């Protein structure tokens, strides 16, 4: 496809993006082998329960928390990797905001749908203070509530002097696997400001040494991922020192995140929950519209669904 063809599609199409975990690199880790580990662990826990599996489950959740969730905390955001990742997202927002503004068509709305399987806050962070309209689906200001109907709205701007009205670009952010700052309350998804506090507190109470390290550290300091069997062996060793029930509080707090955990069953989990089902429906409807274009960024399509 040449530039002329691409320009035509941008001018005349409904624009959609699908953004995966690779887009948040190098600051945040990709899933790596966590999906395979959790899937196999779930199979073992379904067939027979033993305390070692609970310890392994907590350890894998903690590894995912440390590498993907915890770095989104405000005091973690620093360094070259963070700056590079944030800049990449800002360039994305600036470029497409300009392109939507320059659209000649008055038939198409100046909206761009950003569908993402990422649960991190990098896009929200990048948009903060830029003067760009990012619609994350929440309505209200004191206790914002998630409502998919918000993605059906357009934003108009009226000039001060001539009362001329024009549509301004809006980025709809549809997080189809949930988000770390989502919380459940009275059958609603609400915006959670203190999303990491309770998990952090449980980790502090327990200490890192109660979790299996998912990596082998070589004599040269290089890390290599442990096999599933090695993780279970590590859990068996911890089982001799700690009661499996000591991990309950951490697992309970972790599972309060309104996210789809990385397992091969995640598609089944997604369609069973009302809000995730609605987001998948919006994704499907967006692609079925006439003249729809989907750009895919940082998405490997490596998992089964």
PLM regions and their residue ranges:
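Extended, H/D-rich, highly charged conserved domains that either
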Residues: 108-261
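Extended, folded domain segments that form the structural surfaces/walls around functional sites
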Residues: 27-30, 34-37, 220-226, 304
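A Trp-anchored, charged/polar loop motif used as the substrate-binding/catalytic surface
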Residues: 1-3, 93-99, 151-160, 271-282
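Short amphipathic alpha-helical segments, especially helix-boundary/capping motifs
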Residues: 96-100, 255-260, 282-285
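Gly/serine-rich nucleotide phosphate-binding loop at the start of the catalytic core
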Residues: 1-143, 166-169, 174-177, 183
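Short linear motifs at secondary-structure transitions and domain/linker junctions
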Residues: 85-91, 143-154, 268-272, 294-300
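Active-site-proximal helix-loop elements at catalytic-domain edges
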Residues: 75-82, 250-269
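SIR2/sirtuin-family catalytic core signature
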Residues: 1-17, 23-27, 110, 227-250, ...
């Amino acid at each position: 496809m040449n530039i002329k063809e691409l320009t035509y599609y941008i001018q005349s199409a409904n624009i959609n993006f699908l953004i995966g975990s690779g887009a948040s690199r190098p600051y945040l880790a990709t899933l790596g082998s966590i999906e395979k580990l959790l899937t196999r662990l779930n199979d073992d826990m379904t067939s027979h329960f033993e305390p070692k599996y609970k310890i392994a489950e907590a350890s894998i959740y903690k590894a995912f928390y440390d590498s993907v969730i915890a770095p989104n905390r405000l005091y973690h955001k620093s360094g070259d990797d963070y700056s590079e990742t944030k800049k990449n997202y800002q360039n994305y927002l600036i470029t497409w905001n300009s392109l939507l503004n320059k659209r000649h068509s008055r038939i198409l709305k100046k909206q761009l749908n950003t569908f993402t399987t990422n649960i991190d806050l990098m896009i929200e962070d990048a948009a903060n203070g830029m003067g760009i309209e990012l619609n994350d689906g929440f309505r209200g200001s004191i206790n914002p509530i998630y409502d998919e109907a918000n993605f059906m709205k357009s934003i108009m701007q009226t000039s001060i002097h001539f009362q001329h009205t024009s549509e301004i670009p809006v980025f709809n952010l549809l997080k189809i696997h949930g988000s770390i700052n989502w919380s459940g309350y009275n059958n609603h998804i609400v915006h959670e400001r203190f999303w990491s506090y309770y998990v952090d507190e449980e980790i502090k109470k327990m200490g890192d040494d109660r979790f299996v390290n998912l990596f082998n550290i070589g004599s040269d300091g290089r890390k290599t991922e442990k096999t599933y069997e090695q993780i279970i062996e590590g859990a068996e060793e911890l089982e001799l020192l700690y009661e499996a029930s000591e991990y309950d509080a951490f697992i309970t707090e972790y599972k309060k995140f309104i996210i789809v955990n990385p397992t091969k069953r995640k598609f089944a989990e997604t369609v069973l929950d009302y809000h995730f089902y609605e987001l998948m429906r919006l994704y499907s409807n967006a692609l079925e519209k006439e003249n729809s274009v989907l750009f895919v960024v940082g998405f490997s399509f490596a998992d089964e669904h």
